[in-house]
């Protein structure tokens, strides 16, 4: 009787004499990205701190003022080479332009010289999903993340003068936020 009881205990403790072994393999993958990138706006490729200065408009001739180019560059903290790997964590990168009052239906709002001058700002990169005039209704430009990770977005700005423009100086501002999703 003692033998049968001991055998039964061993049988139950070992799982009925049947042993199961399973190998499970779990693979994790992740993108490691820099968490902080900083922005530099180069005006006319001169590193002009994001300030564009347009030529003089002569109302008597009505000739347009030549456009000016500017580039938005992104750098990872401490880097001297442009690029922002943080975009690789998303699927689309977006530059969203304009705080309240900076854009209207005609473009970037300016003050001075009659207050009717607008600045037509457009993305020029082929990878931009929108290359029309930035306005209050169309103020976002999206890019593929592989392009955005290179850290360079190019734009062109051109002032548009109304017929009743007055002599004087004008100025405007356009802010933007860079995001990725």
Curated annotation (Swiss-Prot):
Gene3D superfamilies named in the record: Fimbrial-type adhesion domain
Highest taxon listed in the record's lineage: Bacteria
Biological-process GO terms, alphabetical: cell adhesion
Keyword Signal tagged: yes
Disulfide partners: 37-84
UniProt KW keywords: Disulfide bond, Fimbrium, Plasmid, Signal
Signal peptide: 1-21
InterPro entries linked: Adhesion_dom_fimbrial_sf (IPR036937), Adhesion_dom_sf (IPR008966), K88_fimbrial_pA (IPR016372)
Cellular localisation: Fimbrium
GO CC aspect terms: pilus
Quaternary state and interactors: K88 fimbria, 0.1-1 micrometer in length and 7 nanometers in diameter, is composed of about 100 identical subunits.
Protein name: K88 fimbrial protein A
Organism: Escherichia coli
Gene: faeC
């Amino acid at each position: 009787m003692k033998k049968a009881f001991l055998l039964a205990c061993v049988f139950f403790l070992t799982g009925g004499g049947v042993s199961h072994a399973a190998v499970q393999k779990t693979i994790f993958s992740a993108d490691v990205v820099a968490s902080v990138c900083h922005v530099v706006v180069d005006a006319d490729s001169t590193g002009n701190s994001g300030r564009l200065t347009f030529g003089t408009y002569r109302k008597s001739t009505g000739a347009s003022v030549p456009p000016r180019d500017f580039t938005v560059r992104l750098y990872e903290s401490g880097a001297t080479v442009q690029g922002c790997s943080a975009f690789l964590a998303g699927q689309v990168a977006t530059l969203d332009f304009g705080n309240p009052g900076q854009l209207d239906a005609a473009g970037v709002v300016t003050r001075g010289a009659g207050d009717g001058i607008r600045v037509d700002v457009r993305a020029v990169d082929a990878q931009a999903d929108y290359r029309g005039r930035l306005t209050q209704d169309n103020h976002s430009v999206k890019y593929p993340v592989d392009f955005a990770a290179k850290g360079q977005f190019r734009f062109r700005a051109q002032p548009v003068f109304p017929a009743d423009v007055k002599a004087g100086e004008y100025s405007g501002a356009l802010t933007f936020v860079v995001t990725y999703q």
